[in-house]
Amino acid sequence: MRRPRRPGGPAGCGGSEGSGGLRLLVCLLLLSGRPGGCSAISAHGCLFDRRLCSHLEVCIQDGLFGQCQAGVGQARPLLQVTSPVLQRLQGVLRQLMSQGLSWHDDLTQYVISQEMERIPRLRPPEPHPRDRSGSVPRRAGPAGELLSQGNPTGSSPAVQGLSRPPGDGNGAGVGSPLSSLQAELLPPLLEHLLMPPQPPHPSLTYEPALLQPYLFQQFGSRDGSRGSESASGVVGHLAKAEDPVLFSRSLSKAILGTHSGHSFGDLTGPSPAQLFQDSGLLYMAQELPVPGRARAPRLPEEGGSSRAEDSSEGHEEEVLGGHGEKSPPQAVQADVSLQRLAAVLAGYGVELRQLTPEQLSTLLTLLQLLPKGTGRHLGGAVNGGADVKKTIEEQMQRGDTADARPPTPLLPGHPTASSTSIKVRQVLSPGFPEPPKTSSPLGISAVLLEKKSPLGQSQPTVVGQPSARPSAEEYGYIVTDQKPLSLVAGVKLLEILAEHVHMTSGSFINISVVGPAVTFRIRHNEQNLSLADVTQQAGLVKSELEAQTGLQILQTGVGQREESAAVLPRQAHGISPMRSLLLTLVALAGVAGLLVALAVALCMRHHSKQRDKERLAALGPEGAHGDTTFEYQDLCRQHMATKSLFNRAEGQPEPSRVSSVSSQFSDAAQASPSSHSSTPSWCEEPAQANMDISTGHMILAYMEDHLRNRDRLAKEWQALCAYQAEPNTCATAQGEGNIKKNRHPDFLPYDHARIKLKVESSPSRSDYINASPIIEHDPRMPAYIATQGPLSHTIADFWQMVWESGCTVIVMLTPLVEDGVKQCDRYWPDEGSSLYHVYEVNLVSEHIWCEDFLVRSFYLKNVQTQETRTLTQFHFLSWPAEGTPASTRPLLDFRRKVNKCYRGRSCPIIVHCSDGAGRTGTYILIDMVLNRMAKGVKEIDIAATLEHVRDQRPGLVRSKDQFEFALTAVAEEVNAILKALPQ
């Protein structure tokens, strides 16, 4: 988005904003500017903001900020950028930034364009006369012109004694043009070498924030640390004559980040330190072409192994043979060098004889750089005038356009070796000239050669193949889990690896990223480490590398780079066979676990179906197998044959109802099992014989139909839930004085069906208690009293209800505490006696019948009337609050014990759980239905029975599971009675 034009813009000099210095600068620029204003000026700064150029323009590299031009056919401006120029531009940018201006502002564009006009320009390159295509530029001018004809005006003994530079093997000689990088760097270098020394300039500081976006986009770092490190590496190379480190291929980055000067008006030239850096740039821009030839393996050295040398490290191999071509004569090379040196010095009006030996030595070292890099342009070249629009990011990624080597046939068994990725090539130090390269015909026998290393060491090699056949290049690789792997992350990984193997980061060359892997090569180093050694060390320190980089290293090794830029692994160190085996075992265990879980689920489902079938088979003849059917039919025949022997219970005289509880327990015929018995007998007492077998058959068929037809059971339960009792008011229970006596507000007694206490005997002077009488058939005699678990302040009311109703049996269906929630308060003493209002309760005994229930005996006394009674509490322990017991057998056995104690009583049974609804209603429903069947009732309707009891207390049997449990319990009891019939 373009910012609005500010008052201090080009329209005038009287803006109210900004400092006085900036306004004065703008006024001076306006007075000295062109009449056309800034409308005709192309935008500057597209390297920092790509939005400055329209879709019809491209951003070209001008060595500073980038300039928008319409099309790529125009010549690139050649600016003679020096340190004073950079200092001037830096000050202007700082002033513009302090005013809050951006590249989009017209004032910024106008000021920058005026400053760019003041920078000296170099003449555009002219095509070389010998170049047919004319695509290779040649720089002309007094500082950079190379003359290919004529002899030097003179020669001095110092010149004759200088060592001659070698040829590059490609025919680059007298007429070799300079690259754009050389053309820009040679003039200030020569000026420094030939002119008198200047006083040292004060060091200037450069603020990276001014070019922070550019540094971040190109270097992958916001502080530009990589560029500065590279520049310092070049200076160190020139000082120590060591191997150069990787350097940026962009001239503008290094110049903008490192140039310094005195002032804009002082054009005496850059500082000596800067010239050394520029010479490092010039050196790094060179690239030695790699001819196609076979790589010779090195003979084993003492104490070391034989390692294959890298053919791209710039080391030339010398092949000796009887039919080889001889190198050019040394005299011809000397003439060529002297001609080139004289041509360069002629532009300065200096002759060779006027130079000192030190100056000649320095110039000769610089001259050795001139033939290299022929026809190459930093930042990418325009081939054949192709109209291709490139952004600066694409140019910086491509860098130097690599020469495509024609495919050559390889030896049998060797893969094709060609590299399609852009790589940074390293060359020899200029202090160690390369031997001339010769060719060898086919069929030559292997001979020992002396190959010069960068450190000047002589290393024997064996050449056994023709030099015209190159072999595949070997690369070290590290495969990570990040795909694609960024170049910044790959370089960081190699820097950390260099620290672990005690190498410098400059030892890694030809760094590139292929998918999740980073590939590299190793130059000669002091540790004499090869690619295999470095990759092996990377595998050993894999954990440290992963911890420091955050990447997971999957594989390391050495391989050959193919045309697809893929790496053929030769040696793997990342994943050990033990780890692979462990991962395989874990995967197999997971699959086996899934299969086992599936099998268990299927078995459980099959077992559930089988259990249902067995239950149906046990309930009636239709669902039973053949043996059960025959047994059932035989049972029916025996029952019909002996029917006269069994009379109905109505014809028999009822036993006396005045026997006490103590007599029941003292009767020897009815003695209970041992107190420590854990599994009570199922048929402990004889089943009653007054059930008609036809009635039992009808009941079993009814239960079987319910168990088979789940939909019918669901519909029946829905109808029960929709049933509403009439009347159903609970005004008394909701009264102000009675609401606190209720444990659960949803389960209250109806006004027409509630237990009323005597007010004169009640400690609270109220007749209310949360209890409901449940009538079976006689309204004058309720069979049950359904009540809630007593609260701490209603225990006295509970014992008053027990005393006034004459109850002798209490059925408790809940534990005192369940899952940390109190279900009922203890209303009896732990031991001894306790007084509740006027009722004294003594604990006589506590009989643990089994793990599911226990029996307690109490002695109850009214201290006012001195009357005493005995009563029994049956406490069932294994019934969860929101569910049902795991089996019906413990509850049915519990019911038998209760009825055995209650037999012959005319008083109601007090049944309570926590809320007096769910478990209480389920027990009452089961007991009422079974009692009716025992009395010989022909028709049984369990749903109608539940509606009958719900008319007297709401919420009895709270869930469908409890209703189904009641049906199952009734069916089990009927089946037990039929099995107990005499044979």
Curated annotation (Swiss-Prot):
Cellular component GO terms held in the UniProt record: axon terminus; endosome; Golgi apparatus; neuronal cell body; neuronal dense core vesicle membrane; nucleus; perikaryon; plasma membrane
Biased composition range(s): Low complexity: 652-681
Protein name: Receptor-type tyrosine-protein phosphatase-like N
Top-level taxon: Eukaryota
Polar residues compositional bias, start-end: 148-158
Organism in which the protein naturally occurs: Rattus norvegicus (Rat)
Modifications made to the protein after synthesis: Subject to proteolytic cleavage at multiple sites. Subject to cleavage on a pair of basic residues. Following exocytosis of secretory granules in pancreatic beta-cells ICA512-TMF located in the plasma-membrane is cleaved by mu-type calpain CPN1 to yield ICA512-CCF. N-glycosylated.
Protein's UniProt keywords contain Glycoprotein: yes
N-terminal signal peptide: 1-40
